[in-house]
Amino acid sequence: MYDKGPVPGRNDACWCGSGKKYKKCHSAFDERLERLWEEGWEVLPRTLYKTPADIEGIKRSAAINVGVLDCVGEHIAAGMTTNQIDQMIYDYTVEHGGTPADLNYEGYPKSVCTSINDVVCHGIPCDTDVLHEGDIINVDCSTILDGYFSDSSRMFCIGEVSAERQRLVDVTRASVEAGLAAVKPWLPLSVMAEAVQKTVEDAGFSVVREYGGHGIGKEFHEDPFVGFTTEAPDVDTIMAPGMVFTIEPMVNAGAPDIKISKGDGWCVRTKDGSDSAQCEVQLVVTEDGYELLSW
């Protein structure tokens, strides 16, 4: 059944911290989720829906997260190494009171993932990866502030890029916009996934299946897994107000198949050597749609 935890009395204070009586606040919310669960939909445990205080905490974290990517955008250029990007992100985050969430996460050695051209995700910064004119790169960073996590990534084009690479980046961004437009409370994740998948595949590109978005807030990766195809796991999960997750499709110019580096165990590349792009935003579902938290 729907895990709604301890249920307050109808006249007791609501579990969300609003100060309102439960019957005037989240009583109907809990009842609606329970009905949806009984109908066969997936619903998150109550503890994964964020309270107003949680959202404010995530927003403070996200302000650093957005700021650091703005900083990267101002300085990234041909001739820069990915290690220099990593140092920039570490310095900015720490100077603003945050902690890079990637650093030492499950053994990951850096503060950011830098994924160039055919690298799908989890490229590890180093001194030998030098940006060249015509490259495309995804910079994916995550931030912790006061126990709250934020996460986003952006694509950067280094100088003049080929028409093919520019189109891949543009379609990837458009797929995220299509996904956002499909986010509505009380609908399943599948409607968002379908919008992303259609945008990508109509353009002749493919969506990576093995990686996707995720819930996030008080932990780096929370349920649900957020896939971007209609057959992905958890697509029957209902998007309810207070749910925080990321939309971050990884889009390949060729086939969706990937391979993981046997050397570092992290770097993911396209199996056929085609280019890949990714954009990531973090949002909270609201009563009438969504609010962007980081981008």
Give the positions of each predicted feature.
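Active-site neighborhoods and metal-handling regions in enzymes and metal-associated proteins
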Residues: 6-10, 18-295
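Short cysteine-rich clusters marking metal-coordination/redox-active sites
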Residues: 14
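Conserved N-terminal segment of EGF-like repeats
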Residues: 1-5
